[in-house]
């Protein structure tokens, strides 16, 4: 059993006690339906209500963790059904942090990831209600490469109008590039960063 409070009560999520059969870190809500989808990717959301809203709108390849952060167990489970996951967390600070935490976990499991930008809306339900399923599909298609998403977030952490801030930003980019073990992949991202920021700073 898994439940979510509809108001502001606590705890936000309430699940049955964990057993050998029910392990939150190795189960995904909606996977029983999503795994049969013909889409080439699965969409990872924050919670039950996101999945329900998306399935109602026709996006049946959406899943969510059971009120917990993404784990290596979740990533391994996703790997069994897809090579690519779209991270679709809320557009607030907590959602951004969750995406940043999830990217390396998925990468370690051998799953490619992209990040969907829902702004100016907070979550999938709000976006779909205001913009419709077609516009939502377009946002999915525009999902950012996960590495370049990290680069964009890093850019916002430094005073880019100052040379020192620019220097610290590019040092951060270099650190992230060194995390990439594959030389070809690293060179491709170097080119992508140069292309994006050439002439800006």
Report residues per predicted region.
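Phosphate-handling DNA/RNA-contact segment within nucleic-acid enzymes
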Residues: 1-81, 85, 98-99
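Alpha-helical scaffold segments in soluble metabolic enzymes
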Residues: 33, 53, 77, 101, ...
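Acidic, metal-coordinating catalytic cores used for nucleic-acid/nucleotide bond scission
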Residues: 49, 70, 89-99, 117, ...
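Glycine-rich phosphate-binding loops that contact phosphosugars or nucleotide phosphates
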Residues: 74, 93-97, 101-108
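Short, hinge-like loop/turn segments at secondary-structure boundaries
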Residues: 81-82, 103-105, 130-137
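Histidine- and aromatic-rich ligand-binding microenvironments
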Residues: 84, 90-91, 134, 141
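C-terminal or mid-to-C-terminal helical accessory/interaction module adjacent to the motor/catalytic core
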Residues: 111-200
């Amino acid at each position: 059993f898994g439940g979510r409070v509809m108001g502001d009560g606590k705890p936000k999520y309430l699940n049955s006690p964990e057993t050998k059969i029910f392990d939150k870190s190795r189960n995904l809500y909606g996977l029983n339906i999503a795994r049969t989808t013909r889409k080439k990717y699965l969409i990872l959301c924050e919670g039950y209500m996101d999945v329900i809203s998306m399935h109602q709108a026709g996006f049946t390849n959406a899943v969510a963790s059971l009120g917990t952060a993404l784990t290596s167990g979740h990533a391994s489970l996703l790997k069994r059904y897809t090579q690519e996951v779209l991270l679709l967390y809320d557009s607030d600070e907590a959602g951004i942090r969750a995406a940043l935490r999830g990217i390396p976990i998925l990468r370690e499991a051998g799953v490619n990831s992209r990040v969907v930008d829902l702004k100016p809306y907070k979550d999938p339900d709000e976006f779909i209600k205001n913009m419709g399923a077609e516009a939502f599909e377009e946002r999915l298609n525009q999902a950012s490469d996960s590495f370049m998403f990290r680069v964009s977030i890093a850019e916002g952490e430094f005073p880019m109008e100052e040379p020192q801030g620019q220097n610290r930003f590019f040092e951060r980019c270099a650190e992230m590039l060194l995390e990439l073990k594959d030389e070809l992949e690293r060179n491709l991202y170097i080119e992508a960063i140069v292309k994006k920021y050439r002439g800006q700073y």
